[in-house]
Amino acid sequence: MSRSNRQKEYKCGDLVFAKMKGYPHWPARIDEMPEAAVKSTANKYQVFFFGTHETAFLGPKDLFPYEESKEKFGKPNKRKGFSEGLWEIENNPTVKASGYQSSQKKSCVEEPEPEPEAAEGDGDKKGNAEGSSDEEGKLVIDEPAKEKNEKGALKRRAGDLLEDSPKRPKEAENPEGEEKEAATLEVERPLPMEVEKNSTPSEPGSGRGPPQEEEEEEDEEEEATKEDAEAPGIRDHESL
């Protein structure tokens, strides 16, 4: 049977059991033929799997005719989609969505290379977008910087004004304080003079007269006592 399987050639629409690594023999259908120019066992068929509606490229050694292998591989299986695949291969072998999906998947499988180009194009677009965003970011950054500089200048000016303003009131307060002190001194100084004018020099023990007058009074008293002491002696001599 293996010899007949190796020599078997399939055509589009043939129903088979396809074997993939990690999966049981799965009901499938041949959708695409290998290139006619190259005929060798290395050529692979595009296979559509019933139940899962997935496609894969398999060689002839992994394909088994459905009718001949139905009893062997057509036993129920718990794998998801397997029982649905058995139903589809019996009741709807030419499912409409299968042809569209197979051709679509074929284009996706056969043309994986343009995707990097598209990715590169997206990268360029992203780069341009990033570049533009960088430029916008610079503009946005520059504007806040200017605003910060302006705000800093305003803050400095305001700080200078605040520093000057407390100094000025102090300077303004000092002259007023000096004027007040001078006024109080002027008010206090004339008081002794008025008291001296009101007081009389004849008042004994007042202590408010000037010290020179007191000294003169003491000298006069001393001279008067001396004269009184000398006077009795002179009188006695005259009597003799």
UniProtKB/Swiss-Prot annotation:
Residues 69-240 are annotated as: Disordered. Pfam families: PWWP. GO terms for molecular function: actin binding; DNA-binding transcription repressor activity, RNA polymerase II-specific; growth factor activity; heparin binding; nucleotide binding; RNA binding; RNA polymerase II cis-regulatory region sequence-specific DNA binding; transcription corepressor activity. It comes from the Eukaryota. Heparin binds at K19, K21, K72, K75, R79, K80. Sumoylated with SUMO1. Sumoylation prevents binding to chromatin. Ubiquitous. One of its GO terms (cellular component) is collagen-containing extracellular matrix. A motif (Nuclear localization signal) lies at residues 75-80. The modification Phosphoserine is found at S132, S133, S165, S199, S202, S206, S239. The keyword Disulfide bond applies. Residues 110-121, 212-225 have a biased composition (Acidic residues). GO terms for biological process: chromatin remodeling; negative regulation of transcription by RNA polymerase II; positive regulation of cell division; positive regulation of transcription by RNA polymerase II; protein localization to nucleus; signal transduction. Residues 12-69 form the PWWP domain. A motif (Bipartite nuclear localization signal) lies at residues 155-170. Keywords: Acetylation, Cytoplasm, Disulfide bond, DNA-binding, Growth factor, Heparin-binding, Isopeptide bond, Nucleotide-binding, Nucleus, Phosphoprotein, Repressor, Secreted, Transcription, Transcription regulation, Ubl conjugation. The modification Phosphothreonine is found at T184, T200. The modification N6-acetyllysine is found at K44. There is a cross-link at K80 (Glycyl lysine isopeptide (Lys-Gly) (interchain with G-Cter in SUMO)). There is a cross-link at K80 (Glycyl lysine isopeptide (Lys-Gly) (interchain with G-Cter in SUMO2)). InterPro entries: PWWP_dom. PANTHER family: HEPATOMA-DERIVED GROWTH FACTOR (PTHR12550:SF41), HEPATOMA-DERIVED GROWTH FACTOR-RELATED (PTHR12550). The PWWP domain harbors the heparin-binding sites and is responsible for DNA-binding, while the C-terminal region is essentially unstructured. The N-terminal region does not contain a typical signal sequence but is required for secretion. It also determines exosomal location. Belongs to the HDGF family. This is Hepatoma-derived growth factor. It comes from Homo sapiens (Human). The lineage of its organism: Eukaryota, Metazoa, Chordata, Craniata, Vertebrata. The gene is HDGF.
